[in-house]
Amino acid sequence: MRSTFSYLIIPVVLMMGSVANAQVHFGSTTAYNATFVLDKGLSEDPRYNSTYTYQTSPIGFNFGVDIGKKFGLQLESILSNQGQIYDVINTAKEIAGSRKIDLQYIHIPLMMKFMGSGDATVRGNFNFGPQLSILNRGVESLVTNAGNFQIPEGVDFATIKQDFPSATDNGNGTYNIPQNIPSRDILKKELDDFKNTEFQLAAAFGLDIDLSRHLFLTTQIRANYSLTDMRNKDIINALQAGDYSDIFGGRANFIVGVQLGLHYYFGTLRSFGSRK
């Protein structure tokens, strides 16, 4: 908690120096996102097929400073649920289970905001900046039904036997699981299988809509992408060494969605200030 507070307060303090000659606003947001876990290994594995996964960022807060009509800075804190579900596919190309990556982050982006300079009630904007993402919850789980499954290229049956003790080798590049295997956790935050923090890039474009002299609404299409693998080094090394029955590939978070926000502006919003 102390480190999270530090990440929030230090940029705010740095921004305060410009407040005297700028306009300040703060607000809250909510968002609905399509979330992806981009994993090269899972995408190349014939046993898995990615599905469209949707999650919410139920609440977010921001503090912004507009330095003139065209540019501003905005510090945000966003609670974000994300991850992805992969279907487990057997040799008959049927769904035979699921692999679920369930993540929750506190995103702390510092955005540069480029705005339209006019005095219209509705104005366009583009935002871009670095983002620190703090993992709050992380679980990767697997449910597998009985059936025959293809052995991926580069993976041997001995490794599969370690992960699925009841599996038998069919001798033709496939293996059999004789009975359903209930949900089990593959990776967990509590076991330090995930990195606690990630560095990401965030971007958004949308509209500022003045509602009154001090209130404005924002609507944005927003995305962020992680530049580092979410798993810790020990897990990555074990995958590269072939200690798991998965194909190794880099893994990244990517989300894109629609965000709505309501903000209070200290001073008079420009569309009202220009009215006679």
Over which residues does each language-model region extend?
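Outer-envelope beta-barrel architecture signal
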Residues: 22-26, 69-73, 106, 120-126, ...
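Residues that define the transmembrane beta-barrel architecture of outer-membrane proteins
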Residues: 53-57, 102-108, 122, 195-201, ...
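Residues on the lipid-exposed face of transmembrane beta-strands in outer-membrane beta-barrel proteins
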Residues: 28-32, 59-67, 108-114, 128-132, ...
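Extracellular loop and loop/strand-boundary signature of outer-membrane beta-barrel proteins
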Residues: 44-51, 93-100, 188-193, 244-250
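Glycine- and aromatic-enriched membrane insertion/assembly motifs of diderm outer-membrane
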Residues: 49-94, 106
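Outer-membrane beta-barrel translocator domains and adjoining extracellular loop/strand segments
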Residues: 38-45, 80, 85-94, 138-145, ...
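Predominantly the C-terminal beta-signal and adjacent terminal strand-loop region
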Residues: 193-194, 198, 206, 210-276
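Short glycine/proline- and aromatic-enriched beta-strand/turn motifs that initiate or cap beta-hairpins
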Residues: 22-60, 194, 263-276
